[in-house]
Amino acid sequence: MNLSSSPDQITRDFFDSLLLETRYLDSSIPSTEITLFGHSFSMPVMTAALSHLDNTAPGGMVTYAAGAAKADVLHWVGMGSEQELEAVLATGAKTVKIIKPHADNRVVFGKMEHAVKAGCIAVGMDIDHAFNSQGGYDSVFGLPMKAKTTDEIRDFVQAAGVPFIVKGVLSPYDAEKCIKAGCAGIVVSHHHGMMQYSVPPLMVLPDILKAIGHDIPVFVDCGIESGMDAYKCLALGATAVSAGRHLMPLLKEGADAVAARIGQMGAELAGVMARTGVASLSQMDSSVIHKRNF
């Protein structure tokens, strides 16, 4: 057997190992609507917190946000200048700003303050950018990073003034610490395979939910390419999912193309919900999923 060490391939293989049963009797037309952080959206498929999309297409960050706004989904954004974030928000996209774990916490507080003043509905941090692959602290575009303590995360939570979310959680261990810090949500993610042999987010999701319950939103990131992928995450307990790299090639075609693909993913999700007897997101049931063992 030729086993890959690539987390992206491992994640894809895990998605493809999950099979669904159907439930037609007494089923009805489903609704994919969801409320997150006090705002209503058309579906639980969100855009992922990407950065530097101008390298993919001119004005890529704004195009990405405009696509999210047109599709009526929650938008996430990563690194970028204050001016870029303001342009993203000018599209009307309801946006979550994710901030790197800068070594100097004053940088973190400053970026949070600007994001909230500019109109972001939530902020957060991708904690997995703390270390490099050689065991030292990471550096992102020359900016020094550092691992954060639970107390530091609590300080960010208390200072934010809006919901604070931790991205890069891949264990019950970190999830429980996020709860202790008062986080308003977590993103289960291996950050596009930052570490070889990382467990697929969807694989560890049930263990995380067993540890922390459903008191806060638990989002799933990495490898989401279809409404079927989204359904599998939701059935196993995710609140919503993020699609990122799957949408990147569409940036050259414009916001309408991005919105159209997100809309298609929502329709794919609704199609699977209908065929498995799920009328609303609150009725998701993990017992519909079977693991391939052949």
Regions from the PLM with identified roles:
Residues 1-41, 284, 290-294:
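An N-cap/entry alpha-helix motif that binds or orients negatively charged groups
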Residues 66, 91, 103-220, 227-251, ...:
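Alpha/beta enzyme core
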Residues 69-105:
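A gly/proline- and charged-residue-enriched helix-loop-helix capping module
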